Amino acid sequence: MDRQEVASRTALLGLKAVDEALTDFVSRSGKADGLKQLRCAFLSGTSVGGMDLSEVFWQEHRDDLAGGDARSLSMHTPGDVTSMMAHYLESRGVNIVFSTTISTACSAAGNAIMLGSKMLREGLCDVAIVGGTDSLCRFTMNGFNSLRILDPEICRPFDESRAGLNLGEGAGYLVLTADSEGAVCRLTGWGNANEAY
């Protein structure tokens, strides 16, 4: 990561999670050097990208037109987060042959896992690093609040008196391969539907 580059909270959460996934994969499979030869796809799901930094910039710039660190806008879009993370993986010796961002709200990380599985099955990559990252920001909180679906109480999804959802932030990544060497689990299937009209 360039010293002049500004990292959003979404990117920082993602970098930590992808580093843990990669470290675990290397220790289980023993393929530290092999990652340079393997064709790796990086598929990352996120919705807000670097919106947290954009919000800070907007507030500073609104109050003083000369204010605000414009570098923070370099992390605004979801793709900027993925790009930063892909560069980090390359600095760790990972041979990234394909990288993309999936921004489908709550299903983004699941869609990244499905796409990575399909790419492995079609022989488009040898390893797929898949998952997602998102941080809380005013944009997300206000968006869900405007829908009037936030519950002010703790999460209770199966309770008859439930009154909405609770928002959180986090990141999680997996390393998928076609072989079972060092595998922790097996992905046996997936499903995806768009039930809107």
Regions found by a protein language model. Give the residues of each.
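Active-site-proximal alpha-helical scaffold in enzymes
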Residues: L15-V26, P78, T82, A86-L89, ...
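Solvent-exposed alpha-helices and their adjacent loops that cap or buttress functional pockets
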Residues: A32-K36, S91-N95, L120-E122, R148-D151, ...
